[in-house]
Amino acid sequence: MPQTESVKVLVTAGPTREPIDPVRFLTNRSSGKMGYALAHAFAHEGHSVMLVSGPTDLDVPANVDFVRVETAAEMHEVVSRYIGRMDVAVFAAAVADYTPAVVQPQKIKKMGATLTLELVRTADILGSARQPFGFTGTLVGFAAETENLETNARDKLVRKGCDLVVANDVSKPGIGFDSDHNQILLVYPQHSEAFPATSKHDLAHQIVQAIQEIAATRNSPTFQSS
């Protein structure tokens, strides 16, 4: 294993909430546990960590800078502001792909048998990392899939310029969303590596080790062997 010096790491975590009206919003089942575990693991290795998180009930890990956001637009703005200072960026958040076109200023009343909402695409935060954000460091994405796990993850890796995609099958019971455990596939440009189901805490440390090895191969001076 390469011996590492402190580097600057950005981790995103949790869901986003896209408001419909003052009392309702669109969200997803992400608990944020994997992202928070990664932030903890990076900090444990002595790195300087910024955690950008959507709404969760989790405690912020020690020795981690923390920014809380609500919406995909807010997360996009925070990431765009800070990513240029980072050596590593890990996008573990489950960011909404769509948001209501119009946020109603008052609570929508129950009228009629159906309600139609117009949704519009949110900005692609991971897809913006290389361009237009101009990030040149080690880039890691996450892929939560229900089918074609490796194929979909590899497609994301190529399209978004990632060095690594951490993929998991969220259709499997007992792992992934809401769980303290996960089963992942690390997808690299030339190969993949499967990890059996275990705690997100343990997986986070394994993922961090993998990221440190990737960064060393990118000839980052802060990740050279001592």
What spans do the regions from the language model cover?
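A cross-family phosphate/adenosyl-ligand binding-site feature
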Residues: M1-S226
